[in-house]
Amino acid sequence: VGEPALVALLLGKSAQADERGIALTITEDTYLPSDADNVPLIPQEMITVLGNMIDNAMDACDREDPWVEVSVSLQDHALLMRVADSGTGMDAAEFARAMQRGYSTKAGREPEQHGLGLALVAQVIRRHDGELTADVTYGSVVTACVPGRAG
């Protein structure tokens, strides 16, 4: 995988998924060089974005045989992070609400403890003029794309 912070995050999330009975797969094309000049996010931002995306995906896996698939790569000088899961996904309106601080799909839980993850993801992505999108295929797919640094 290359980038040490990404390796540590993926190892930790893999262990969490295993404890929860979720099949977490890292795609074969996942790779980020450890050369920070090529990556548009600093490691802490990458952990915030990808960590929250994976957490949300694991929480959304409500089908039998739950799974999450993670892909991270540099494509055309842009950082592309994609997390797919076996959950039902969100329509466009719900996804837009989920990017607002305080909104949570996790019913019955303390509101002050939820509704921050996707808002933080969106904040980091917007700060770097990136794009955060969601699609529903067999499950849900959330993609964060951050353009490369100029210069």
Predicted features and spans:
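Conserved ATP-binding N-box helix of the HATPase_c
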Residues: 42-65
